[in-house]
UniProtKB/Swiss-Prot annotation:
PANTHER family in the record: UPF0102 PROTEIN YRAN
Domain of life: Bacteria
One MF term in the entry's GO annotations: nucleic acid binding
Pfam families on file: UPF0102 (PF02021)
Protein name: UPF0102 protein alr1796
Family: Belongs to the UPF0102 family.
Length: 140
């Protein structure tokens, strides 16, 4: 399976997890000329203010070289995500007053054997870490 397909499956896994914890998925793979945001999700707590999360998903196999994907969230990558988030908010001005944050989801995957009845498909995914407000950007 290609790297792109694995990444998409990791994003599917995180989107399902977010939905199971009360988040609404607004967009998947939102892109513009500046970059792409894997998942944009909204959550409202007890009829209070809504939170908008711009989620970067990093899906890695065991023994990877970049600390489970954490090493790939460089300052340059953060700036691209911030610019893309600004484009999203300009396109959807009704969301501009929401509390915004930038989250990172670290997902591990591994191939499964024929005897592993708990997994579906060729791979087993596990959310290693979900980091809310993993980095700060200034959105106006």
């Amino acid at each position: 399976m290609s790297h792109l397909n694995i990444a998409n499956l990791g994003e599917d896994f995180v989107a399902q997890w977010l939905q199971s914890t009360g988040w609404i998925i607004l967009h998947r793979q939102f892109s513009c000329r500046w970059g792409e945001i894997d998942i944009i999700a909204q959550h409202t707590r007890n009829n209070q203010e809504s939170i908008l999360a711009f989620v970067e998903v990093k899906t890695r196999s065991p023994g990877n070289w970049d600390d489970g994907g954490r090493g790939a969230i460089t300052l340059k990558k953060q700036a691209k995500i911030e610019r893309t988030a600004k484009i999203f908010l300009a396109k959807y001005p009704d969301k501009a007053e929401y509390i915004c944050r930038f989250d990172v989801a670290i997902v591990a995957y591994q191939g499964i054997s024929q005897q592993d009845h708990a997994a579906i498909g060729e791979y087993k995914f596990q959310l290693q870490e979900y980091i809310p407000a993993a980095f700060d950007c200034l959105i106006y």
